[in-house]
Amino acid sequence: QIAANANFKYKTAVENYEKINHLYEEIRTSPGALRVIPKPVAKYDELTEVKAKAAEETYEAGIQALLKNTREDAKQAYYYFNDANTFSPGYREAIEMIEQAKFNATLKVVVQPSLINYRDWNFEPIVFGYNANMFVKFYTPQQAEELKLEKVDQYIKVIVNGYQEGRPIITSKTESFSDSVKTGEKIVKGVKTPIHTKVSATLTTYTKKITGRGSINLIITDAGNRAEIKNQDIIADETWSDSWGTYKGDERALSDGAKRLCQKKEPYPERTYIENRTRKELDNRLSNELRSFYSRY
């Protein structure tokens, strides 16, 4: 039964007929179910007929939504046209209307280039790599001009404030070790007995830490009134640390871990290691900020 005035009545009918046909196939392939329901009913002909009407129904809904000329209505139109094309592939101009609705629904953001900055850091790949919301698209100024975009919604810019690396900070701690080690044997009443000697050592453990800090500024501006929508500093700190040791006394008193520590020399990170790690963390934080901000669109 299809209600005369129900919203999307044919779309609902498609869903119901598909459920009936699924149940029909389940029964048809189950001997036990066939004993209970020997003549299951299928609705394939009805489904074909109602799909055509559902395509028309959702296509017209898409047209009406698109005529309202808002981003949110264009989004809805996009889904309506997709439904129409699913019900009847290639229905009228459904494919073209899907593209038009998506274009109308898309927030168009022009990425403004940054000035020459520290080590030519470039965060544009992170911005252009954003894909968490299909209704947000970023353009270079050249692309916006070539495409003759009638309306730009926002401008976005990432400014590199700089990178600083602190002086190495070295801390130390000293601890004592002692042990009893076998140094020989003696015969006591005809029995070999080990001779133990107490040994001791002091271990000094040195830890070197170097911290790098990078900072960028994310600015998003409304293209219509040039008001700043977002102006945020994004900061990343990255710390490198390593340890080595020295000892005084008898090495035999040291644990295996302490011995390995004493075999190391004072460490130094690779020249750009901390900087590269800091840059990678800035990439991650910028990506997260974009994902969070544009999720509302």
Segments and roles (model prediction):
Residues 1-6, 116-132, 149:
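Start-of-domain marker
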Residues 1-64, 68-104, 204-297:
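C-terminal/domain-edge helix-coil "capping" segments
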Residues 96, 137-143, 198-203:
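N-terminal post-signal-peptidase region of extra-cytosolic proteins
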Residues 110, 117-119, 181, 252-254:
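Short, intrinsically disordered/low-complexity patches at protein termini
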Residues 111, 115, 134-157:
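Short beta-strand->alpha-helix linker/helix-N-cap micro-motif
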